[in-house]
From Swiss-Prot:
It comes from the Archaea. NCBIfam families: mtrE (TIGR01113). HAMAP family: MtrE. It comes from Methanosarcina barkeri (strain Fusaro / DSM 804). Keywords: Cell membrane, Membrane, Methanogenesis, Methyltransferase, One-carbon metabolism, Transferase, Translocase, Transmembrane, Transmembrane helix. This is Tetrahydromethanopterin S-methyltransferase subunit E. The lineage of its organism: Archaea, Methanobacteriati, Methanobacteriota, Stenosarchaea group, Methanomicrobia. The gene is mtrE.
Length: 302
């Protein structure tokens, strides 16, 4: 394949991966999945009932791996056995995966809330009905974009792995990046806004999450709206860069042409550049904002 065409395909893959990363993070925010959900789960036990969708089917990596694998398996069967158009097959596979994901989401949040009835945690059916459709929408977008990335890598770039295997791997990857990147914005900056930023979380405040929004009670829509400003886009950029840069080095330095070691060296150089960049940003932030300073009341109580 011509290098120019390969770079065009890589650009399309990078765009799809960026969209997938953003939608994956917002899906986990509106449904409260992964790391921050431990505080949502703990809140009723600390006598703080809430209206936040509490699914946490599993960790994000296995959840997204299952979702993407189901979509890829359905698409593969439709393409190979029913000779369906790849575009329609990917769309239909993503729809089936979103429906399966929604089923797990509903049973998960209802089971969790029902198990907390002793702590006076209600099951809000209107909240479940209103949240499940955007959860399905985000899941569909994430799965479809992952399937597009996997299909282009398999068919156009000639990747040796089958579609389902690639979708499984990218599902784990996008879940891990969303859990480690975007969820920090939701858990650290949204759930505990009533405490001063940078002060950390005292053990006695565990479960004391923000339950009241700007108007009325807070729910997953408020969290998704907030995280769409930073957490979602950052997750999209992180996953998009991972997919694009990971494929770019082997496209420029093709191992099939005896340039495998150059691709390894290029990858190491990119990693070192990112490490230095991250270190520079951390040092700048520490110098600009400094450590957290206790106020006089806290010093007196100490």
């Amino acid at each position: 394949m011509e290098p120019l065409i390969s770079m065009g395909v890589l650009a399309l893959i990078g765009v799809a991966a960026t969209i997938a990363g953003a939608s994956e993070d917002l899906e986990s925010d509106i449904g409260s999945q992964s790391n921050p959900n431990s505080q949502v789960q703990l809140a009723p036990q600390m006598m703080f009932p809430h209206r936040i969708f509490n699914k946490a089917i599993s960790g994000e990596p296995p959840s997204n791996a299952l979702m993407c694998s189901i979509g890829a398996a359905v698409a593969t069967v439709l393409i190979s056995e029913f000779t369906m158009s790849p575009l329609f097959a990917l769309v239909f596979g993503s729809l089936i995966a979103a429906c399966v994901h929604a089923t797990f989401a509903v049973t998960s949040t209802m089971g969790r809330c029902a198990s907390q009835s002793r702590f006076k945690q209600p099951i809000y059916l209107d909240m479940i009905r209103s949240h499940i459709t955007p959860i399905m929408g985000y899941a569909f977008i994430t799965t479809f974009c992952i399937l597009v990335v996997s299909y282009l890598m398999t068919v156009v770039l000639g990747h040796p792995f089958p579609l389902t295997m690639l979708a499984f791997i990218w599902g784990i990857t996008i879940g891990a990046i969303g859990s480690s990147t975007g969820d920090v914005h939701y858990g650290a900056e949204r759930e505990f806004q009533q405490f001063e930023f940078g002060s950390g979380l005292n053990a006695s405040n565990s479960g004391n999450i923000v339950r009241y929004a700007e108007s009325g009670l807070r729910d997953g829509f408020d969290n998704s709206w907030f995280c769409a400003k930073f957490g979602g886009p950052v997750t999209g950029l992180a996953f998009g860069m991972t997919v694009f840069l990971g494929s770019w080095i082997t496209t420029i330095f093709d191992p099939a042409k005896g340039l495998g070691w150059l691709s390894v060296i290029a990858g190491i150089v990119i990693v070192f550049i990112l490490i230095i960049w991250n270190w520079k940003m951390e040092v700048y932030a520490r110098k600009a904002y400094g450590p957290y300073k206790e106020d006089k009341t806290e010093e007196a109580s100490a």
